[in-house]
């Protein structure tokens, strides 16, 4: 069985994104043109356009495209701003953010995901800085150094309001996560 990824991408945009209020035309355009499957390890490639959460071995997961792109859309217009992405996974959101901004810092805890992320950067799929910090270390820091970021995206849900992030963010920073 050989999967037609181009058709899968088109179906994702039509049936998942457009049908569920992803309306930002420049965001959709970038998504339509990016071969998301190239970010996935071979054993997960067939799930690149799935509308399900993909659970991995180390208690981490990949959000479904619709959820990821709702978060990106919630960031509003992205110019070449300084962006922090927490829980970067395989780089599925990073790759699209990078079409708008070249100033992206990322945090990921999973060694499996970090390896895939670094390989994708080596392959030229996107460009970002992977910070030497785990997600847990970031959230346990009472005074995270995040003043420089205009936008912060947390690819996951939080049990409580991220007070330390809010207190230490720049005045006009936009912060999005799943509640």
Segments and roles (model prediction):
Residues 1-96, 100, 112-116:
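Class I SAM-dependent transferase core
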Residues 76-179:
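Conserved nucleotide-cofactor-binding alpha/beta core module
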């Amino acid at each position: 069985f050989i999967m037609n990824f181009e058709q899968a991408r088109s179906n994702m945009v039509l049936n998942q994104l457009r049908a569920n209020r992803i309306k930002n035309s420049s965001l959709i355009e970038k998504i339509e043109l990016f071969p998301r499957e190239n970010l996935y390890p071979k054993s997960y490639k067939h799930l690149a356009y799935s509308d399900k959460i993909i659970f991995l071995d180390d208690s981490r997961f990949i959000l479904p495209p619709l959820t990821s792109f709702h978060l990106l859309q919630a960031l509003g217009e992205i110019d070449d701003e300084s962006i922090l992405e927490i829980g970067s996974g395989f780089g599925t959101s990073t790759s699209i953010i990078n079409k708008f901004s070249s100033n992206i810092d990322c945090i990921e805890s999973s060694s499996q995901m970090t390896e895939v992320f670094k390989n994708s950067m080596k392959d030229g799929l996107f460009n970002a800085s992977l910070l030497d910090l785990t997600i847990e270390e970031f959230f346990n820091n009472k005074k995270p150094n995040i003043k420089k970021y205009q936008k912060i995206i947390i690819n996951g849900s939080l049990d409580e309001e991220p007070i330390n992030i809010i207190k230490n963010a720049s005045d006009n920073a936009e912060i999005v996560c799943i509640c």
